[in-house]
Amino acid sequence: MAAKASFNWIDPLLLDQQLTEEERMVRDSAEQFAADKLAPRVLEAFRHEKTDPAIFREMGETGLLGATIPEAYGGSGLNYVCYGLIAREVERIDSGYRSMMSVQSSLVMVPINEFGSEATKQKYLSLIHI
């Protein structure tokens, strides 16, 4: 009789082994940011029913906003796997901040990058990630 395979509770879909080294580094950085910078402030924000805008400046400075935007426009130039990993780590702490991050990164920055003129990209993309 064959031995039963063990279930990996930390990585049930075995995604980690499919990631590149860069993707793991991005995930780990996002996890660290979420644990160190986001988590301690979320409870306080809930208690006072407010959002801390400084978190978004810090996300931009860390390269978590506009992750797929080319570096030439102030983004991180990462792939969409990295973007998904960043979103997952922020979501793990708070879905509201992840939603705001996604709106800024995907619904605002991506259309400007994909469809904006060079002048529009130069004018806005380097500003909105911080």
Regions found by a protein language model. Name each.
Residues 2-6, 27-32:
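Short, flexible segments with low predicted structural confidence
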Residues 1, 128-130:
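Polar low-complexity intrinsically disordered regions
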Residues 25, 32, 37-128:
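Glycine-rich flavin
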Residues 1-22:
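Intrinsic disorder at enzyme termini
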